[in-house]
Amino acid sequence: MAAHIVTVMTKIEETLKIALEAHAGQEDLDGNPAILHPLAVGLMGNSDAEIKTGFLHDVVEDSSMTLEDLKNKGVEDEVIAALALLSHDKEKVGYFEYVENIIASGNVTAIHVKLNDLHHNLQRGKVSYEAAVASND
């Protein structure tokens, strides 16, 4: 049992290191370190996959890392599948269609992480709701 916990924690730590690397030097709309939001979303997760996906949910959109890069760094297929759904190509898909696609996928990890993402975005409250939605369109 102890070995399993160490393995799980090591994978979560590796995922956290990837997120820290990807968001190094970035700031959010409020001027805070960008990593704080993915950390909060990850810590809201109810499973290892949700924690890891939460930590990485903004990496593809907000850094030069791709899903393939993440896969090459050892990120599990379950997390990659959720990240593929959570990565929003704003040029091709409107925000509400993007959210509908996540829901329609039935991917529980992606759905929970998106809910946690929205919850944390609304909690922060410094940037208006309208500005947050506009930044996603």
Question: What are these model-derived regions, one by one?
Answer:
Residues A2-D137:
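Active-site helical microenvironments for divalent-metal-assisted chemistry
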